[in-house]
Amino acid sequence: MLHSALALCLLLITVSSNLAIAIKKEKRPPQTLSRGWGDDITWVQTYEEGLFHARKSNKPLMVIHHLEDCQYCQALKKEFAKNEEIQEMAQNDFIMLNLMHETTDKNLSPDGQYVPRIMFVDPSLTVRADITGRYSNRLYTYEPQDLPMLVDNMKKALRLIQSEL
């Protein structure tokens, strides 16, 4: 009786350890801060970290406010991630942050809290409320067809650094 109980225990231990190994080997998608906006871009995790890196590197911070369940955000994200010019500028010339929640800085929502919303902050830590999209009722929103304007606004943010700082 003791012998069979011991054998049963060993069998249970073997099965459970093999199961644990199989679970560990299961492939999981990597967790990334890009959230689909561009996996080759270096993203910061928080607004405070973004401000620190913007000041340190003398690059503008681009803040993208979005939500996963927003169809407009998803459409913009898809085109943003496919646009090579935006991806290159974002990787090389900007500190990048995408947020799915609001920050405590009220300057990042001068005309309200809505998504998608893209704001620029220069290295002197000034929110550039003068860099706007094409909509008068949502100044900082962009739609997929607005990507040429977003490219122009990214270039404008870079020019303003050179001329003002």
From Swiss-Prot:
Interacts with LYPD3 and DAG1 (alphaDAG1). Keywords: Cytoplasm, Endoplasmic reticulum, Signal. Residues 1-20 form the signal peptide. Disruption phenotype: Knockout mice develop ciliated cells with normal-appearing cilia and histology. However, ciliary beat frequency was lower in airways from knockout mice compared with control mice in presence of calcium (20% lower in the absence of stimulation, 35% lower after ATP stimulation). Knockout mice show reduced mucociliary clearance. Knockout mice do not seem to show endoplasmic reticulum stress response. It is found in: Endoplasmic reticulum; Cytoplasm. Expressed in the ciliated cells of the airway epithelium. Not detected in the mucous cells. GO terms for cellular component: endoplasmic reticulum. One of its GO terms (molecular function) is dystroglycan binding. A motif (Prevents secretion from ER) lies at residues 162-165. PANTHER family: ANTERIOR GRADIENT PROTEIN 3, ANTERIOR GRADIENT PROTEIN-RELATED. Transmembrane segments: none annotated. The keyword Glycosyltransferase does not apply. This is Anterior gradient protein 3. Required for calcium-mediated regulation of ciliary beat frequency and mucociliary clearance in the airway. Might be involved in the regulation of intracellular calcium in tracheal epithelial cells. InterPro entries: AGR/TXD, Thioredoxin-like_sf. Belongs to the AGR family. SUPFAM superfamilies: Thioredoxin-like. Its main location: endoplasmic reticulum. Pfam families: Thioredoxin_7.
